[in-house]
Amino acid sequence: MSNITIYDVAREANVSMATVSRVVNGNPNVKPTTRKKVLEAIERLGYRPNAVARGLASKKTTTVGVIIPDISSIFYSELARGIEDIATMYKYNIILSNSDQNMEKELHLLNTMLGKQVDGIVFMGGNITDEHVAEFKRSPVPIVLAASVEEQEETPSVAIDYEQAIYDAVKLLVDKGHTDIAFVSGPMAEPINRSKKLQGYKRALEEANLPFNEQFVAEGDYTYDSGLEALQHLMSLDKKPTAILSATDEMALGIIHAAQDQGLSIPEDLDIIGFDNTRLSLMVRPQLSTVVQPTYDIGAVAMRLLTKLMNKEPVEEHIVELPHRIELRKSTKS
């Protein structure tokens, strides 16, 4: 049966439409026997409450928008899983949209979701500009960033301390005796790379009294192919690095394979550390040492923070930093 309305359910259960509405919205002020009668009528008629219509009455649609840069990325799909699990726990539905890391599309999706009357948005994106921040401020509903960096720290966010994470990885390589350490970064247009990761790299070198060599910084785009290209560039230099830190595991795989194609042995000739601890780190030989970013937890905590903001619960920290660690495997000398 199609187009069953709340009126049909009320008539079938012999109750008022207000009572049906209270049952559908989980209002406790309904007698158990009446609730049972209404739920049975809903089941019999196949009634599906319309989230937006319910939202007009309750001012809530129990729907959350999630904007993701690359739906095919192992990293972002794991983040989305954390978001989804907590959303389900708190009985929120999710609208998931892929932005292709395109600013215009991100801003368009933001407005599209607000038009769908979502109760809140989890936003993931590499390059958060002043335009983004202005849109976030204009939003009538809360927005939380997940694994994303906004330099002014005005928008609630959940991530790790990326500057410290890169610093720790470089320091580990310094402590292993390396003095020629290269860094394969993501796009420098993105604050996460320019303001956080690159600064961590520079700080670790400075504290070890090692010079910063601009040629040892190769800019990639997070992909396997850009890892291949980075290694080819670094090995074409007169002075070659003895260790490479990659801003993602996927680029690190490209680095390892390109090095092996050149006849280099990992880790005997070159120590390599990745970043993110995606399952790719276990699929390569030698298995990849990597900075562990608690991806699933970032998604889960971001969604929980959003539920608090949507329900106007007290929030102690708007900028949440989760712990990171380094998992040493076989791509670094023991």
From Swiss-Prot:
Domain (HTH lacI-type): residue spans on this chain: 1-58
Keyword Transcription regulation set for record: yes
GO cellular component, one term: protein-DNA complex
Matches recorded under CDD domains: HTH_LacI, PBP1_CcpA
DNA-binding region location: 6-25
Subunit structure: Homodimer. Interacts with P-Ser-HPr and P-Ser-Crh.
Role, per record: Global transcriptional regulator of carbon catabolite repression (CCR) and carbon catabolite activation (CCA), which ensures optimal energy usage under diverse conditions. Interacts with either P-Ser-HPr or P-Ser-Crh, leading to the formation of a complex that binds to DNA at the catabolite-response elements (cre). Binding to DNA allows activation or repression of many different genes and operons.
Name of the featured protein: Catabolite control protein A
Originating organism: Bacillus subtilis (strain 168)
